[in-house]
Amino acid sequence: MTTIDDYLQGIIKQILESYRHLLDLKDKPGDLEIIKTEILRINGFFKVIIKKIESSQIQSDIYIKLLKQTKHFLSNYEFEREIETMSTLYSDDPNRLKNIRLKIIESLQNNELMETIETIYNLKS
């Protein structure tokens, strides 16, 4: 049987994979679809983390911190509309691709969110 820690660890691993994928992109034509897919995955995983932590009433300080940070991210950052606008006008423009990708990465690093995720991942690995 999978424990909540193991379950969350699996989700965190997938968030890190998506994040690293965003870091590794070279801002070339076609990357906008990848960016869109990865941010949708990350947002979905954040929603799962929130639901799981709240429903299990985990009291661990690191998970409480992660809960607050993921809620903050979801309530303060929304890239889907901007990506949709870009897809019709500028999907092949490397400078615009780089700009949206870096804005997403910066937002994930804001409030030490990715640092907390990496800390949890390293604690459990």
Positions of PLM-derived features:
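Short, solvent-exposed, charged loop/turn and helix-capping segments
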Residues: 45-69
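Short terminal alpha-helical segments
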Residues: 1-45
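Amphipathic alpha-helical binding modules
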Residues: 72-125
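Extended amphipathic alpha-helical scaffold segments
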Residues: 15-23, 43-50, 74-87, 117-118
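Charged, low-complexity interaction regions
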Residues: 23-36, 53-61, 85-99
